[in-house]
Structure formats: C-alpha cells, structure tokens
Regions:
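N-terminal secretory signal peptides that target proteins for export/translocation
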Residues: 1-8
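Bacterial N-terminal signal peptides
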Residues: 13-24
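Boundary at the C-terminal end of the N-terminal hydrophobic targeting segment
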Residues: 27-33
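Cysteine-nucleophile protease catalytic domains, especially the papain-like/related folds used
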Residues: 34-112
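Active-site-adjacent substructure of cysteine-protease-like catalytic cores
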Residues: 106-160
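Cys-His-centered catalytic/binding microenvironment captured across papain-like cysteine peptidases
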Residues: 138-143, 152-236
Length: 236
C-alpha cells in the first residue's frame, strides 16, 4: 500500500488551506474539533497494536454521543480493551483491502484527498490518518493510525490523538519528511475518508458500544437501548 510522502503533501497544504477557509467563510483558519485527549480518547495503552480500532471508535463516539459523558467516563478500561481488540480484528478481516485500494488510488491525486480531509476538520469532525513506513530491507509496510482533530495552518501542523500516548497531544509537522511514534518513524501518510463512516464499521461500533458499556454499581451511564445516532443519520 502506498501513501503520499510528507514532503509531497507539504507543498499542497499551503495552497489549499487559505482557499478552503475563504470558500467556507471561516473566520479563523485553525480547524479545531474540540476533541480532548484526556476525555475523548482511550485511556488504555496501544501495546497490543489496536491503534486503528482506538481512533475509529473514539471518533465515532465523539461525533455521536449527543450529550452522553465522554468516552473515558462511559467505558471502563476493561471495556475499552475488549472493544479495541474486537474492532481491530474486524478491521483486519474486512477493511484492510478497502483501505489499501483507497490509499493507492489517492496517492496519485493528493490535493483532492487532502482538500476533503481539511473540509472535514473545518466542519468540526476529527479525521482518521494512516501513517506508513517500509523498512530499508523492503519488508512489509508498518502501519499506524492516529486521529487528527486540529489544523494549525500557520505552522503547517496537525494535532493528533496518537493511541501510543494516552495523555499527550501529539503533532504531525507536514513540512518534515517523517513522524515518529515511540521507536518507529513513518514517512508516508494517507487520509482514508472511505473508512470514516463505513456502514459495516459503524454497525460494528454500535454493537460493541451496546455490549461493553461501563457500569457504576447497577446503574448504566448508557446502554444498548440508548445508542448514539451519528449526525449523518439524523433527520432534518
């Protein structure tokens, strides 16, 4: 699976951002979804390698909760671990090829892919970002997923939730050629919007939410009957 190198993306960013902001009538060019790492992300470690599941579920719940408490208040660490494990398995079995095909196609047209990515951020929706690196020995690509929630155009920087860091804001500097998470450096990037609201993925997250809800004593903060309704599912 190929992705756009950071150097190639950086030259599109400055050209696109000012035009998008003007076109949308946004006064402040900083795109901030108000996502908060210490509230809206998983509190568990990504040590088992569940990064995609963690960012996808955090995004879905953040956009769908409609007044419910934040993710860390709703789901216990044990429930978070079960959700992350089962959702990562679903992703690995059902969505890897879709993701690879999308990133390969849009590798040839980075400006349009990045434009849609920025439109999502400017509308207040965190966006899934895939990071890739192929080892010097030519082995299989190493993949990592983060969730972008704020765009700082004057610095050409994305603020992201990186599941390897449970309490810290992280930054992807698009002017650089790489991003390092723990001890792995990534040098290619993809914005897989095809996965943001994939119907099968959404259904799986709804199911896992209703199954592994956090309990305080006998009282549920939310339950299988009170499922979040995504904004795109609401009637006007």
């Amino acid at each position: 699976m190929s992705g756009l190198c950071f150097k190639g993306l950086a030259r599109w960013a400055a050209l696109l951002c000012s035009g998008l902001v003007i076109g949308l009538g946004v006064a402040n060019s900083d795109a901030d979804a108000s996502f908060r790492i210490k509230e809206d992300s998983f509190s568990i470690s990504n040590a088992p390698g569940y990064c995609f599941a963690m960012v996808a579920f955090a995004r879905w719940y953040y956009l769908s909760r409609q007044g419910q408490p934040s993710l860390r208040k709703v789901l216990s660490p044990a429930a978070q671990l079960r959700i992350a494990r089962e959702l990562q398995e679903f992703y690995s079995q059902n969505l890897i090829k879709l993701q690879a095909d999308y990133c390969n196609v849009h590798h040839a047209n980075p400006s349009e892919s990045f434009r849609r990515f920025l439109l999502g951020l400017l509308s207040g929706e965190p966006q899934i970002v895939l990071l890739m690196n192929r080892g010097s020995s030519g082995g299989a690509a190493v993949l990592h997923a983060v969730l972008a929630y704020e765009w700082l155009p004057e610095r050409n920087v994305l603020k992201v939730y990186d599941p390897n860091y449970t309490r810290d804001e992280r930054f992807i500097d698009l002017d650089k050629k790489w991003y390092t998470s723990l001890d792995i450096t990534y040098n290619a990037i993809c914005f897989p919007e095809v996965l943001n609201a994939h119907p099968a993925l959404v259904r799986r997250m709804e199911y896992l939410y209703s199954r592994y809800v956090h309990r305080i004593g006998d009282q549920r903060l939310a339950g299988p009957i009170v499922r979040p309704t995504a904004p795109w599912q609401q009637s006007n």
